[in-house]
């Protein structure tokens, strides 16, 4: 396996843009030593509930927490909801050829002579001349005729359709409530391990009403997870500022966005989402097809390297690998290459214009002071609020964050530049002194946040 040379621990220490890798069948079969190297090179992991049983989720999270305990290094765990998508019902493979007339029917299953779709919302949404996209956009079908429970379309490309494949209508959102019933059941099934889940990612959210519904469900089930909102439809982009403000983390889901917008428009949409998130100081990730060729190749293409470099240079908090690590042949090489590329990007990211208030100004002042002194920033925080505020201003050095709350430590691990440390302490003064004793060997600017409007800052030159 061809992978970048170098000490992966050094790579991890220098990465300010965080790395998230999706766990799946490919990571399940890594040898113990390979899994350790793999997790050394990421800051968080993602598990897609659309492709993982409750037992698989439990197995993967246990492996991460075992590593975390052995290394004393917190990692964020993200579970990704399937969302209210429309998918093909049960069917034998259907080989569609370009120019062929294809029929969709309202049905749970098919003998392979038509495409079964067990959801009326699909047939309500589709109109004549619409374009139906399947297989990540590789299969395009132009709608020629519709009925209340059937649709005819002409294939504009070829492909093989199997059960469970997603169906997208170009430029349209389905009128389906969020969370979907499947998501409710999935969250109930994994609720026994809810304390190990740091973020729940919402798919196909269109408004803050959708986000609030998921938050209410999480509260009802006893989850304390933060909510990441995936921006992946035109409806979400149209409500972008609203969605960004009601989320804890924003994700540019490029795969689905590419189905709703022309591929030539995708870079513009991506930049808009990133800039809006930075404006409101919300952590922002970009996901999907970053190193896609590494599903079958031990090295990325030059175009992929340039894409990762350019995307990171926009100032994102994290980059998420999906199929590259979940089902690809070279998961360890993929995270190694991601780290290697990011090493050349960090210090070229400009400061981002952000909304200002007094607490923002305090955080910005800390960042500027540390930068002028060539110092690290040390923060002791109970909730992580000040640490996140500091990260908004994109410090150029590592920010060590001590916290007595392991959940806070885990959630901060995928925020720009933050290096969380679990430090038990009864109060802020004790916690900051413990942090300084661990990480205060070089010039530093240290603080423990805001209590009643009073700031305490220590500087070592």
UniProtKB/Swiss-Prot annotation:
Q: Please describe the relationship between pH and activity.
A: Optimum pH is 6.0.
Q: How is its activity regulated?
A: Not activated by classical allosteric effectors.
Q: Name the cystine pairs.
A: none
Pfam families named among the record's database cross-references: PK (PF00224), PK_C (PF02887)
Q: Which domain of life is it from?
A: Archaea
Site Transition state stabilizer: which residues? 230
The reaction(s) catalysed by this protein are: pyruvate + ATP = phosphoenolpyruvate + ADP + H(+)
> Which Enzyme Commission numbers does its entry carry?
2.7.1.40
Q: Report the temperature dependence from the record.
A: Optimum temperature is higher than 98 degrees Celsius. Thermostable for 2 hours up to 100 degrees Celsius.
So which cofactors does this thing need? a divalent metal cation
Q: Offer a single GO CC term for the protein.
A: cytoplasm
GO molecular-function term, one example from the UniProt record: kinase activity
Q: Which residues bind K(+)?
A: 48, 80
Listed under GO biological process in this entry are: glycolytic process
UniProt pathway: Carbohydrate degradation; glycolysis; pyruvate from D-glyceraldehyde 3-phosphate: step 5/5
**InterPro entries tied to this protein:** Pyr_Knase, Pyrv/PenolPyrv_kinase-like_dom, Pyrv_kinase-like_dom_sf, Pyrv_Knase-like_insert_dom_sf, Pyrv_Knase_brl, Pyrv_Knase_C, Pyrv_Knase_C_sf, Pyrv_Knase_insert_dom_sf
Which controlled-vocabulary keywords does the entry list?
A: ATP-binding, Glycolysis, Kinase, Magnesium, Metal-binding, Nucleotide-binding, Potassium, Pyruvate, Transferase
Q: Per UniProt, where does ATP bind?
A: 48-51, 87, 165
Annotated binding of substrate, by residue? 46, 255-256, 288
Where is Mg(2+) annotated to bind?
A: 232, 256
The entry describes its oligomerization and partners as:
Homotetramer.
By sequence similarity, the record places it as follows: Belongs to the pyruvate kinase family.
Name the UniProt record assigns to this protein: Pyruvate kinase
């Amino acid at each position: 396996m061809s992978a970048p040379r170098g000490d992966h621990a050094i790579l991890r220490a220098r990465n300010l843009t965080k790395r998230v890798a999706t766990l799946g069948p490919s990571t399940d079969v890594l040898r113990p030593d390979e899994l350790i190297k793999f997790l050394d090179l990421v800051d968080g992991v993602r598990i897609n509930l659309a492709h993982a049983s409750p037992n698989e989720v439990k197995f993967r999270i246990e492996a991460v927490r075992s590593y975390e305990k052995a290394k004393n290094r917190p990692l964020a765990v993200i579970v990704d909801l399937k969302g209210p998508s429309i998918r093909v019902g049960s069917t034998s493979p259907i080989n569609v050829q370009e120019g062929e007339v294809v029929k969709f029917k309202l049905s749970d299953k098919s003998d392979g002579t038509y495409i079964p779709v067990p959801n009326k919302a699909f047939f309500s949404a589709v109109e004549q001349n619409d374009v139906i996209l399947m297989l990540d956009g590789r299969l395009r079908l132009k709608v020629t005729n519709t009925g209340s429970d059937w649709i005819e379309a002409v294939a504009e490309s070829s492909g093989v359709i199997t059960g469970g494949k997603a169906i997208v209508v170009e430029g349209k959102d389905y009128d389906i409530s969020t969370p979907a019933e499947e998501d409710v059941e999935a969250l109930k099934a994994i609720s026994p391990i809810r304390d190990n889940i740091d973020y729940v990612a919402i798919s196909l959210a269109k408004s803050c009403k959708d986000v609030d519904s998921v938050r209410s469900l999480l509260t009802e089930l006893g989850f304390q997870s933060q909510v990441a909102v995936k921006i992946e439809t035109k409806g979400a982009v149209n409500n972008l500022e609203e969605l960004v403000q009601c989320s804890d983390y924003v994700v540019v889901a490029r795969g689905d966005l590419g189905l709703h917008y022309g591929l030539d428009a995708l870079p513009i949409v991506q930049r808009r989402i990133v800039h809006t998130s930075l404006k409101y100081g919300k952590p922002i990730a970009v996901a999907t097809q970053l190193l896609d060729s590494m599903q079958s190749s031990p090295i990325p293409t030059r175009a992929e390297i340039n894409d990762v470099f350019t995307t990171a240079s926009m100032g994102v908090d994290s980059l998420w690998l999906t199929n590259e690590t979940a089902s690809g042949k070279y998961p360890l090489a993929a995270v190694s290459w991601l780290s290697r590329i990011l090493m050349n990007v960090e210090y070229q990211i400009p400061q981002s214009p952000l909304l200002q208030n007094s607490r923002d100004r305090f955080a910005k002042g800390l960042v500027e002071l540390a930068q002028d002194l060539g110092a690290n920033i040390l923060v002791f925080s109970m909730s992580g609020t000040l640490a996140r505020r500091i990260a908004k201003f994109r410090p150029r050095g590592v920010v060590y964050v001590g916290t007595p709350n392991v959940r806070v430590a885990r959630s901060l691990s995928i925020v720009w530049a933050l290096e969380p440390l679990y430090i038990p302490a009864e109060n802020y003064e004790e916690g900051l002194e413990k942090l300084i004793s661990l990480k205060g060997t070089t010039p530093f600017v240290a603080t423990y946040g805001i209590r009643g409007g009073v700031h305490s800052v220590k500087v070592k030159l």
